[in-house]
Regions:
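C-terminal ends of transmembrane helices
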Residues: 1, 50-63, 116-129, 167-180
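Alpha-helical transmembrane segments
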Residues: 23-52, 93, 131-236
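Hydrophobic, well-ordered secondary-structure scaffolds
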Residues: 98-141
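N-terminal transmembrane signal-anchor/hairpin module of polytopic inner-membrane proteins
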Residues: 1-106, 110, 207-236
Length: 236
């Protein structure tokens, strides 16, 4: 990453394909220790597409529309093929006797929006050294703890692999950063956190499903909303 303006925190060129190290570390761990059912294989396929897109974007600077379309495709794979969907969530209306709200035909688009939204949310906070990988580490460790407490070992193994990859990369990304994760790493982390949060929380523990992912990923979600508002206000 070559600093081209005064807004850049770094003054010297810094490699920005560090996300490949995160992805490689995670993939090795999950292939050795993970439990690869159809849903997880679909998630890994979608993640591979996200990583490939990130590499091309880091090297060639792809257009936003193309990236958005590819991200939708990557999100649709586990949703449509792996049956990874937000089918219901807790009804927060105190006047209603219905404990859950069923999304029905809206489950597929709602889940794709969730995955693409969180993928880009983590990408947008990757502006300061160590911020995105730090937030992702905290989110992964929190999901790991929830999975262990609820006895969901496949999710626990997945989150342990993701947290380990993040923590291993973190010393090289803290200020002053020696390497950046680039879009390759940030979008991969966002994609994995978004998909696994559905697998581990939404489908099996509906009571905490809506609250926990938003609490864990609150910083990138609100940062994304703030960035969108600022860009719209500035006419960009």
């Amino acid at each position: 990453d070559v600093p081209k303006d005064a807004r850049r925190m770094h003054k010297k060129p810094i490699p920005r394909l560090g996300g490949l190290a995160i992805y490689g570390g995670f993939l090795c761990s999950i292939l050795i220790f993970g439990q690869l059912d159809e849903t997880m294989l679909c998630v890994l396929l979608g993640a591979a597409i996200i990583v490939a897109l990130g590499i091309f974007d880091d090297v060639l600077a792809l257009g936003a529309k193309l990236k958005f379309v590819v991200q939708i495709v990557a999100a649709a794979i586990p949703v449509c093929i792996g049956d990874l969907q937000i089918g219901l969530f807790t009804n927060l209306n105190p006047l209603s006797d219905t404990p859950f709200v069923h999304l029905g035909i809206l489950a597929v688009p709602a889940t794709i929006i969730w995955i693409v939204g969180i993928t880009n949310a983590v990408n947008l906070i990757d502006g300061l050294d160590g911020l995105a990988v730090g937030v992702s580490s905290i989110a992964a460790i929190t999901m790991l703890a929830v999975a262990l407490l609820t006895g969901n070992m496949p999710i626990a193994i997945t989150m342990a692999a993701l947290a380990g990859a993040c923590i291993g990369f973190m010393p090289y990304n803290l200020n002053p950063a020696k390497i950046f994760m680039g879009d390759t790493g940030s979008t991969f982390l966002g994609y994995m956190l978004a998909t696994v949060s559905i697998m581990g929380l939404f489908k099996f523990y509906a009571v905490i499903s809506f609250a926990v992912p938003f609490l864990i990923l609150g910083l990138p979600i609100f940062d994304t909303a703030n960035a969108i508002i600022r860009r719209v206000a500035a006419g960009r």
